[in-house]
Amino acid sequence: ATCSASQLSPCLGAI
């Protein structure tokens, strides 16, 4: 997934 440590919120569902 394309995630940053500072943007985990939108990432949680993208992983």
From Swiss-Prot:
GO MF annotation, one: lipid binding
UniProt keyword annotations, A-Z: Allergen, Lipid-binding, Transport
Disulphide bridges: none
Superkingdom assignment: Eukaryota
Function description: Plant non-specific lipid-transfer proteins transfer phospholipids as well as galactolipids across membranes. May play a role in wax or cutin deposition in the cell walls of expanding epidermal cells and certain secretory tissues.
Family: Belongs to the plant LTP family.
Protein name: Non-specific lipid-transfer protein
Organism annotation: Solanum lycopersicum
Lineage of the species this protein comes from: Eukaryota, Viridiplantae, Streptophyta, Embryophyta, Tracheophyta
